[in-house]
């Protein structure tokens, strides 16, 4: 079944590719360190680490960077354990809802920065660790089409725990329950050896808000400002854009 990729509307990233990759890799490194500190350095016995490594590889993070992050996590366990994940909901102008995921070793600094970001965006910060009913958490796999047969991949995915399957001109998009993502990804990898473009557990909106081009660009610039903050890992939103 064909459909528009929801993912393109949820996670917006800047176009300066080199700087962008460096920021993304730094965020992955921090997640890897925390996962190692909590569950050890062996991905086979640490599902959280295994998922993060899959995410990082899907975004072309070099193997050497991943290994360095694992080594840092092993060598500085106390530092890894000091990182805390907190989630804030909030609204920007024009009724755009956001979920902001923070991973920080200084909660007071992170919250102060977040409050300032919402003020500058003329938005309103919500409660900590409260997820609006507008969003649902799902596992998400994005796979390059290449020469993969759509029907074969769709049927195999649905037989192995996928809940939805979509496609656009370049990619297949597969959705599942968060607890199923590692198993589903592994089964697809063994069967098809595809090129994964994304492996994520993410928040997807149940309702979208569509704005004119001028206001869409303003909101996207505000989201960029959030993502520039060193403590902010991800921003999910319900703004629909082309």
Curated annotation (Swiss-Prot):
Gene3D superfamilies according to UniProt: 1.10.10.200, 3.30.70.980
Record has Oxidoreductase as a keyword: no
Keywords of the record: Cytoplasm, DNA-binding, Transcription, Transcription regulation
Location relative to the cell: Cytoplasm
InterPro entries registered for this protein in UniProt: Integrase-like_N, TACO1_YebC-like_2nd/3rd_dom, TACO1_YebC_N, Transcrip_reg_TACO1-like, Transcrip_reg_TACO1-like_dom3, YebC-like
One Pfam family hit: TACO1_YebC_N
Keyword DNA-binding: yes
GO CC terms in record: cytosol
A biological process from GO: regulation of DNA-templated transcription
Any one GO molecular function term: DNA binding
Principal location class: cytoplasm
Family: Belongs to the TACO1 family.
Descriptive protein name: Probable transcriptional regulatory protein mhp472
